[in-house]
């Protein structure tokens, strides 16, 4: 299979995150290899933080797909109402969605940010593969702005003051390298 055909296939989430994509290492594998190598290849458990981050990515990159998220009006995930409505599934809370929608509006209303994200020659969720140290790796750029020769990686954080620690914890440096 040619590199172009592989990249075309990896554009589909079911292939990128599914069996086809598992033949490549990714940045998330680095954390697993560093912290628990025996868990390599295992599906990671969903978390509220990743769910919120995923919703934010979708709101910016593919707003037409926001309906796939289940949203529950509840103060926390520990309430009886949430547990009944979620059916054991991890769902977004309405106040989380409200905050993300406000963040999205602010980003897109900013002339610089909105222009870089919605520019003329821009690609979204662009996958790539590379051989590094004899291993095949995959990565996906959230936004590639060709006019500005810029790659944008959207990130969310609960606390801006702890972002530096989060960047270290989640290996954002290696993600940029890949």
Question: Model-derived features: where do they sit?
Answer:
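Metal-dependent nuclease catalytic cores that hydrolyze phosphodiester bonds in DNA/RNA
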Residues: 1-138
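Mg2+/Mn2+-dependent nuclease catalytic core
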Residues: 122, 126-178
């Amino acid at each position: 299979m040619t590199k172009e055909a592989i990249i075309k296939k990896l554009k589909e989430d079911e292939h990128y995150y599914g069996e086809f994509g598992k033949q490549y290492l990714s940045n998330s594998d680095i954390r697993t290899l560093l912290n628990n190598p025996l868990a390599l290849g295992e599906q990671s458990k969903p978390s509220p933080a990743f769910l919120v981050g995923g919703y934010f990515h979708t709101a910016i990159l593919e707003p037409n797909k926001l309906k796939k998220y289940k949203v529950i009006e509840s103060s926390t995930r520990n309430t009886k109402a949430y547990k009944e409505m979620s059916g054991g599934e991890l769902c977004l809370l309405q106040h989380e969605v409200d905050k993300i929608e406000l963040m999205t509006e602010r980003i897109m209303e900013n002339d610089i940010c909105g222009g870089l994200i919605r520019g003329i020659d821009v690609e979204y969720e662009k996958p790539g593969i590379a051989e590094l140290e004899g291993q095949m790796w995959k990565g996906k750029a959230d936004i590639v702005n060709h006019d500005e020769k810029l790659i944008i990686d959207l990130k969310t954080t609960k606390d801006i003051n702890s972002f530096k620690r989060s960047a270290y914890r989640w290996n954002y440096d290696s993600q940029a390298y890949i």
